[in-house]
Amino acid sequence: MNEEIMTQLRSHREVMEAVERELTPRIAAFAGMLVAALKGGKKLLVMGNGGSAADAQHFAAEIVGRFKMERRGLPAVALTTDTSILTAIGNDYGFDAVFRRQVEALADEGDVVVGLSTSGSSRNVYDALALANDRGCITVGLLGRDGGTLKDIVDLDVTVPSGDTPRIQEGHITIIHIVCDLVEKGLFK
């Protein structure tokens, strides 16, 4: 058992080192985009499926509530949280529309719309990001593996260099925490 634990921790370290080496400029760009949008009165919309849905909620919670700094709340919505909206859209339009329909209702030009997908190929995230692009939003993909189909349609892809879903998710939450920290410092320090 100890060997397996050490193997997983080693794998985690290797992915975090790759994130640092390969993604630092992209993480900085992501934070800069979000700071500029929030300064301009825009909002964050964020989405994902499964574990990525939980990460989307976590991201929105840190932005609306606070990360580390005592400050005013900032506008962010996780499109994964309202079961009535999700099931109404899913029932009437299908699962592929659950995020697209919310983007249609909530996204304004200049908002930052973030899609999380460990595969980079979630159809419902793709459709929502495509519509967000059409509406003049800034689109960001927190992705994994090779970035999948989402990599080609977002303004900025931040693709964790791993093919292992748990390591990708760990990369995503680390990136989210870094972005939240940079947003607070960029807006309130």
Swiss-Prot record:
SUPFAM superfamilies: SIS domain (SSF53697)
Residues that hold Zn(2+) according to the record: 58, 62, 169, 177
Gene: gmhA
Cofactor: Zn(2+)
Miscellaneous comment text of the record: The reaction produces a racemic mixture of D-glycero-alpha-D-manno-heptose 7-phosphate and D-glycero-beta-D-manno-heptose 7-phosphate.
Record's function text: Catalyzes the isomerization of sedoheptulose 7-phosphate in D-glycero-D-manno-heptose 7-phosphate.
Source organism (scientific name): Geobacter metallireducens (strain ATCC 53774 / DSM 7210 / GS-15)
Gene Ontology biological-process annotations: carbohydrate metabolic process; D-glycero-D-manno-heptose 7-phosphate biosynthetic process
Binding site for substrate: 49-51, 62, 91-92, 117-119, 122, 169
Protein name per the record: Phosphoheptose isomerase
E.C. number: 5.3.1.28
InterPro entries noted in UniProt: GmhA/DiaA, Phosphoheptose_Isoase, SIS_dom, SIS_dom_sf, SIS_GmhA/DiaA_subfam
